[in-house]
Amino acid sequence: MTSSSFFKNKSNTFNQMRSGLYQGNVYHGRKKCISSTIDHSFTYPVWMALLDLDEIEAGKVPDSFWCSFSPGKLSVTKWRRSDYFGEAEESLSKSIKSLVENRTGLMIRKVWLLTNLSFLGVFNFNPVSIYYCFNSEEQLCAAVLEVSNTPWLDKRIYVLKIQHENDLVCWEKDFHVSPFMDKEHDYIWDLSTPGEKLVIHAISKRRNLEYSQIDWTSPHVSGDAPCTFISRDSIKDHPTSFVVRLDCRRVELKDAAACILSNPCMPLEAVLWIHIEALKVWWNGVSYVNPPPKSRQLGTRDALKHLLIFSIAFIVRYGVVVPVQAMKQMFCSLLLRFQTI
């Protein structure tokens, strides 16, 4: 489905509400290459929110016990302006439109945000939030990726110009995302307008460098900065080092309860999965990669914060002595009981 037909058929397809949830699975696959000595992959269930920022900022999306979008509302999951790019006093839609216009010259009419919602309005973590940007002809013309790394909790903003809906976007990696993968990689992303299904396919190609040639002192780019685009042909023969695929189906907000109950604390689970898979990679012999110069260095407070978050995530996910399914059933039962009070 093209982006223009998606807009035209919206009233019939999504009951005139563009904001909703998407539920499915995410696959991560690490390939053996220079600086990575193993193949390693995993798949986890996920759900994310797709938010029409005009609807959110106009107060058109109804709040519920399960998810809310207004300040001061109590809910299991919550959208918070402060979690995202720009000044908290400025609307997020305006911040993204200005960013894209300044970077590309494109005039943006509408912005959709794909993201994790915060747990209880207290904690949020997004490995990547994606802003889909549409022009006056209702075509997807740009995307903004707001990438967070761990454990440093830096952010990098990538502004990607999309010539055609089904084009692949290729650019150089310049942000230290993982302590078990260096920066000498290039990205290839396949982004299309979310419809009944949401599919994102991204791969990372290893640059043709010998291990001894890697510049470990190359600058680390964070925050808002231009990115370097490259042609797909220039890296087509480079080895694939990493593959990510997100495959989800749409869930209407009126049906949010079942979706959210499957994973009420999605940001905490994301932190848990990242740390568990990192431990597996480290255990299997992949070397730790120190952060590049100019990146924020970890301190004692950061280490304690991550230990606390990991501990909470582990307890919420697995319990202390209660099996995981019993723990989840008990937690979900409490939420349902609280809803009826």
Question: Where are the regions a protein language model picked out?
Answer:
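Mature, function-bearing regions of proteins
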Residues: T2-I341
